[in-house]
């Protein structure tokens, strides 16, 4: 199954939003969990940011190319 760059970027952004909401819920429940959840989210972002930036750049190029046609 071949996924478009838009579909992949949308899925990644949705996953980040879900993780952010989980971190926020943990922060409300417990201050210690807040620091741990944010650290986990930062680790996840540092691990995946290159892929996300690449996909977003490809989406931008695809959008520019589509607009030019």
From Swiss-Prot:
Tissue-specificity statement: Expressed by the venom gland.
Chain's role: May have antimicrobial properties, like most ant linear peptides. In addition, when tested in vitro on the parasite Trypanosoma cruzi (responsible of the Chagas disease), is able to moderately reduce the number of the three forms (epimastigote, trypomastigote and amastigote) by inducing cell death through necrosis.
Signal peptide interval: 1-25
Prodomain residues: 26-39
Gene Ontology CC annotation, any one: extracellular region
Localization in the cell: Secreted
Main subcellular location: secreted
Designated name of the protein: M-poneratoxin-Dq4e
